[in-house]
């Protein structure tokens, strides 16, 4: 793959990442889990900042726009939820929804790490060292940290079987941790 193709794939994935984080923010807001909502709001902003940084780096080093690449508009919120009201969601359904959302988040971060790691290797193989270093320093290392955090939270929630009391109790901690 050329540098242009690698960065086109990265940018498309970053755009998809902002959409993913925004949907998770909406989902947790709907579920009235304000700490998790704020956490994904924070990740949305980080994704947006990363996209701008990637664009700026490419523009400075390649002196051109990143080529366009197909962007998926997949919905991560179940379609039938669009007709629900908050009051329609009982504790069992909410528990299942949180479990599903956390699994999707971990999977998203794994896919992102795989893409960025593969991109790094392809750029190195193409002798595009400065582009490879950017991907490593700004994308691979960042997503590695986010994946470790997501997996840790996922395991924590799995260990308590997504207990609703526990979920409610930790929301203020996440609100505080990810305060603007």
For every predicted segment, state its role.
Residues 1-180:
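Iron-associated oxidoreductase/ferritin-like identity signal
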């Amino acid at each position: 793959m050329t540098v242009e193709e690698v960065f086109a794939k990265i940018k498309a994935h970053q755009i998809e990442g902002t959409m993913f984080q925004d949907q998770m923010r909406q989902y947790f807001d709907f579920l009235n889990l304000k700490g998790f909502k704020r956490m994904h709001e924070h990740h949305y902003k980080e994704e947006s900042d990363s996209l701008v940084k990637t664009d700026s780096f490419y523009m400075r080093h390649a002196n051109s726009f990143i080529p366009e690449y197909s962007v998926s508009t997949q919905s991560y919120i179940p379609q039938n939820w669009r007709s629900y009201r908050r009051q329609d969601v009982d504790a069992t359904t909410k528990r299942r929804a949180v479990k599903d959302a956390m699994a999707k988040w971990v999977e998203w971060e794994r896919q992102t790490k795989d893409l960025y790691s593969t991109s790094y290797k392809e750029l190195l193989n193409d002798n595009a060292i400065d582009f490879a270093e950017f991907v490593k320093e700004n994308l691979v290392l960042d997503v590695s940290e986010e994946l470790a955090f997501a997996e840790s939270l996922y395991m924590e929630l799995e260990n308590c079987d997504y207990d609703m009391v526990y979920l409610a109790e930790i929301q203020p901690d996440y609100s505080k941790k990810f305060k603007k």
